[in-house]
């Protein structure tokens, strides 16, 4: 009985001691929690700042990469656009050249007919009324041909008295002339034509050798004659 009471007293003392110690433990835990609460915002801020720096750095790198890609695509677009524009111009130019070639071929085939009409007009001198009527008839056809040529952009060359130009003219004959200086065209043997500023057919012409060339030629002939005479005289003396 006495022992039981003693045990109860011991238990109560232990409870009292535990109660005395409990506030101290709770206070220590609370202090640790407060310290953790005070350090947490600073650490969080440091972590957030580092993450933000990394994010900004990654975004800058991505932006730089996108700018490079944009510049590359822009250059490709400009180059493709320029190539397409050049292709379009080249196609248009080729079509124009082909058109000119086809028109030139057709008109060149017509020009000999025009030449025949012009020669006939110069040579024929109709006297009777019937001949004059026929002359007027084919001259009307000639005028129609000339008008068609004009509508197609064909224009005749005017060459007499002009400086000889191998790009425009073809020299068939050369002869001395007192009227025309050297390399001037004396006569048109076959008319030349332009088509839209380009040569459709070269003019066949006679070109002057100049007055000096005539004198030189006469002197050469005179020297040749004198040499022949001297040769004959020497032959006679030998005989």
Curated annotation (Swiss-Prot):
Gene3D superfamilies: 3.90.20.20, Head domain of nucleotide exchange factor GrpE (2.30.22.10). The keyword Chaperone applies. GO terms for cellular component: cytoplasm. Pfam families: GrpE (PF01025). Residues 1-50, 209-239 are annotated as: Disordered. Participates actively in the response to hyperosmotic and heat shock by preventing the aggregation of stress-denatured proteins, in association with DnaK and GrpE. It is the nucleotide exchange factor for DnaK and may function as a thermosensor. Unfolded proteins bind initially to DnaJ; upon interaction with the DnaJ-bound protein, DnaK hydrolyzes its bound ATP, resulting in the formation of a stable complex. GrpE releases ADP from DnaK; ATP binding to DnaK triggers the release of the substrate protein, thus completing the reaction cycle. Homodimer. This is Protein GrpE. It comes from Prochlorococcus marinus (strain MIT 9312). The lineage of its organism: Bacteria, Bacillati, Cyanobacteriota, Cyanophyceae, Synechococcales.
């Amino acid at each position: 009985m006495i022992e039981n009471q003693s045990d109860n007293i011991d238990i109560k003392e232990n409870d009292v001691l535990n109660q005395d110690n409990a506030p101290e433990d709770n206070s220590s835990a609370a202090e640790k929690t407060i310290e953790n609460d005070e350090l947490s915002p600073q650490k969080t801020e440091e972590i957030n700042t580092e993450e933000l720096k990394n994010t900004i750095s990654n975004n800058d790198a991505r932006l730089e990469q996108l700018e490079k890609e944009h510049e590359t695509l822009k250059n490709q677009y400009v180059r493709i656009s320029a190539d397409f524009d050049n292709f379009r111009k080249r196609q248009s130019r080729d079509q124009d050249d082909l058109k000119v070639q086809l028109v030139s071929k057709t008109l060149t085939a017509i020009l000999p007919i025009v030449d025949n009409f012009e020669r006939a007009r110069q040579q024929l001198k109709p006297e009777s009324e019937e001949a004059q009527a026929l002359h007027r008839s084919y001259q009307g056809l000639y005028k129609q041909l000339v008008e068609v040529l004009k509508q197609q952009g064909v224009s005749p060359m005017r060459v007499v008295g002009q400086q000889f130009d191998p790009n425009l003219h073809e020299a068939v004959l050369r002869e001395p002339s007192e009227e025309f200086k050297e390399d001037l065209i004396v006569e048109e043997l076959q008319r030349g034509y332009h088509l839209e500023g380009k040569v459709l057919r070269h003019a066949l012409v006679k070109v002057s050798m100049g007055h000096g060339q005539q004198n030189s030629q006469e002197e050469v002939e005179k020297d040749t004659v004198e040499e022949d005479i001297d040769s004959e005289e020497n032959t006679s003396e030998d005989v």
